[in-house]
């Protein structure tokens, strides 16, 4: 006579659980959007302050925002991306600029 739980493969269940636990986290692109009012110097400041770019790379990204309408500032896990978006948007509002920082799934 067979055991009651022959139909369950406990080893496979354990492997599936471990595999699920080891999946890499979802990643998100943090982007700056162009507007007609935020000074270029402020965008450079944001890129240096919140994304740790040197002045040269920050200037390149600022020009991408200016000419293409948006630029990816970095790719992060959900929690980090959400925090950076919130911090940049709050900083822009505190300085009375309409600069918009957004995120989207990478």
Curated annotation (Swiss-Prot):
The UniProt family comment states: Belongs to the ClpS family.
InterPro entries registered for this protein in UniProt: ClpS, ClpS_core, Ribosomal_bL12_C/ClpS-like
What does the record note on quaternary structure? Answer: Binds to the N-terminal domain of the chaperone ClpA.
What domain of life does the native source organism fall in? Answer: Bacteria
**Which PANTHER family does the record cross-reference, listed alphabetically?**
ATP-DEPENDENT CLP PROTEASE ADAPTER PROTEIN CLPS (PTHR33473:SF19), ATP-DEPENDENT CLP PROTEASE ADAPTER PROTEIN CLPS1, CHLOROPLASTIC (PTHR33473)
Do you know which HAMAP family this protein is assigned to?
A: ClpS (MF_00302)
Single Gene Ontology BP annotation: proteolysis
- By what name is this protein known? ATP-dependent Clp protease adapter protein ClpS
Query: Which Pfam family is an annotated match for this chain, by its short name?
Result: ClpS
| Role noted for this protein | Involved in the modulation of the specificity of the ClpAP-mediated ATP-dependent protein degradation.
